[in-house]
C-alpha cells in the first residue's frame, strides 16, 4: 500500500540523492526571492498515477510551494492536457522538478501500459496481475500504478503468500520427493487463510499439482495452444 510515510521517505531519499549539497546552479543563478509557476503538461495520452508523489517532491523541498493537481490517479488524459500547476520559490521549484517528473513519468507509464493490457482482455473473465519483478525500492509506487491502470496486485512479498515456483519444484524432484505429497504437506502446515499457488512450466506438472488441492496454478511460459490445453 502506498502510504504518505512511504512516499515521503522515498522522495526525501531521491531529493538527497539528486542534490546532496543543494542545487548549486539554481542557488547561484536564481535570485533568492524569485518565484516561478510550472505546469505539468502531457505530451502523449495516457493514464495518470502518482499525483501525491509528484506534489511531495515540491512540498518536501519547500513547504510553502503550492501544487494544484488537475487530475486524479487512475484518470485518463490526452496529449496537451494540463495535469498539474506548481507555484512557489523559483529555486525550490527548479530543485524539485526532476524528482517530481521522474516519479510521475514512471508511474504514469506503468498505469498507461497496464490500461492497454486491461483493454485487450475486456469482456473476458481474465484479470491483469502484477509481479514482484519491481524496481528495488519502488515496489509500492509501481504496484500502485498498476492498480491505477485497472490491474490488480498479486502477492506483495515473499511473506504474504506461498508460491512454489519452478526452482522450488526442481529442488524437490531432484531430491527424489513426490510433488503431490510435498505440496499437501505444505498445505497442511500453513494457515488456511494463506493463498497457496504453484507455478508449472509443463503440462505434465498440472495433474500432480491439482491433486494437492492448491488455490492457484500459474502456467509459466506456455504457448497459446498449451494454455488452452492446461486450462481445459
Predicted regions and their residues:
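Acidic/glycine-rich phosphate/pyrophosphate-binding loops and surrounding catalytic core
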Residues: 1-197, 201, 205-212, 216, ...
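Short secondary-structure boundary segments
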Residues: 221
Amino acid at each position: 500500500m502506498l502510504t504518505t510515510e512511504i512516499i515521503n521517505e522515498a522522495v526525501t531519499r531521491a531529493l538527497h540523492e539528486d542534490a546532496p549539497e543543494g542545487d548549486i546552479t539554481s542557488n547561484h543563478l536564481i535570485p533568492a526571492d524569485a518565484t516561478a509557476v510550472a505546469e505539468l503538461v502531457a505530451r502523449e495520452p495516457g493514464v495518470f498515477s502518482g499525483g501525491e508523489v509528484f506534489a511531495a517532491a515540491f512540498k518536501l523541498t519547500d513547504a510553502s510551494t503550492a501544487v494544484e493537481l488537475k487530475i486524479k490517479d487512475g484518470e485518463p488524459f490526452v496529449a496537451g492536457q494540463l495535469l498539474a500547476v506548481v507555484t512557489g520559490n523559483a529555486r525550490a521549484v527548479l530543485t524539485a522538478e526532476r524528482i517530481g517528473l521522474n516519479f510521475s513519468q514512471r508511474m504514469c507509464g506503468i498505469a498507461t501500459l497496464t490500461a492497454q493490457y486491461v483493454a485487450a482482455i475486456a469482456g473476458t473473465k481474465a484479470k491483469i496481475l502484477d509481479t514482484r519483478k519491481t524496481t528495488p525500492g519502488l515496489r509500492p509506487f509501481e504496484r500502485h500504478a498498476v492498480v491505477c491502470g485497472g490491474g490488480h496486485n498479486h502477492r506483495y512479498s515473499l511473506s504474504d503468500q506461498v508460491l512454489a515456483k519452478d526452482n522450488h519444484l526442481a529442488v524437490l524432484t531432484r531430491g527424489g520427493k513426490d510433488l503431490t505429497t510435498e505440496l499437501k504437506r505444505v498445505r497442511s502446515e500453513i494457515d488456511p487463510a494463506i493463498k497457496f499457488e504453484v507455478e508449472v512450466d509443463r503440462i505434465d506438472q498440472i495433474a500432480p499439482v491439482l491433486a494437492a488441492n492448491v488455490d492457484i496454478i500459474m502456467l509459466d511460459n506456455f504457448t497459446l495452444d498449451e494454455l488452452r490445453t492446461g486450462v481445459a
